[in-house]
Amino acid sequence: MLYPICIEKVSDGYVVSVPDVPGCFSAGDTLSEAMLNAKEAISFHIEGMLEEGEELPKSNPIEQYINQPEYKDFIVTVVDVDLSHLMGKAEKINITVPALLLHRIDQFIATHPEYKNRSNFLSQLATNRLLSA
């Protein structure tokens, strides 16, 4: 799931806010560390929200934050947060897919190792689509 983050340079590093996840903040000494810590903070924060019975926060397009005056001096980017471990137990289903589409999915997965297999690919796409709708 892609979440926009807003990174502010401060005297001793970077501070990260996550506008789509209320109350979620992070920091780091370097930009890379700040982004990595933001991914972890988002995952932990959302896990806590779900445990409290709250809804999974919707991710807005990055464009919503790029031109906002409050983020004028910030680096605005996105981080990809794997929330699959929060979705519950996987259930096996059977689906029908046109042969050409299945072939294209397989080709795509072969060149994108972040998608482990067809099921993972389809699950991630469905999750991203439903949570950003």
Question: Can you describe what each PLM-predicted range is?
Answer:
Residues 2, 43-96, 100-108, 119-120, ...:
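Short, charged, surface-exposed hinge/linker loops at domain edges
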Residues 34, 115, 122-123:
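Acidic/histidine-enriched, beta-strand-rich ligand/metal-binding domains
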